[in-house]
């Protein structure tokens, strides 16, 4: 994921956080408040007891962007019926777009490929640029 983002010209910072919605919430808020425009989280979107990434995103109180997760689940069904179990989520918090992707490397790759064509436009809209 990092290499693919860098190939698109993004500055990438990668971190591994411990489980827990509160830790993730604080970290996401700090990054978004510092001016980061896009945060991609991987993992914690399943049905397991430690899967709390969507809850951390919702706790931010930003604007939900449900279409991104809906698109990924819909397109992901062509790869596996299990995509419908994903609790992927996306929110706009201030001027930052935060997307919670599944944790498996294959699902991350597939979902990033699905989102790549629309991410630049989404970020431009958040920045207040024209809706070209």
Q: Residue spans of the language-model regions?
A:
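Non-catalytic beta/alpha edge segments that cap or flank active sites
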Residues: 1-132
């Amino acid at each position: 994921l990092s290499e693919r983002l860098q190939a698109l010209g993004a500055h990438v910072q990668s971190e591994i956080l411990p489980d827990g919605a509160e830790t993730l919430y604080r970290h996401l808020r700090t990054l978004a408040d510092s001016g980061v425009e896009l945060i991609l989280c991987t993992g914690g979107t399943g049905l397991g007891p430690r899967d709390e990434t969507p809850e951390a995103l919702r706790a931010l109180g930003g604007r939900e962007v449900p279409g991104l997760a809906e698109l990924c689940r819909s397109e992901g069904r062509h790869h596996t019926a299990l995509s419908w179990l994903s609790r992927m989520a996306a929110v706009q918090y201030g001027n930052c777009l935060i997307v919670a992707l599944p944790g498996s490397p294959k699902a991350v790759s597939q979902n990033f490929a699905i989102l790549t064509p629309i991410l630049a436009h989404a970020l431009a809209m958040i920045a207040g640029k024209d809706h070209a």
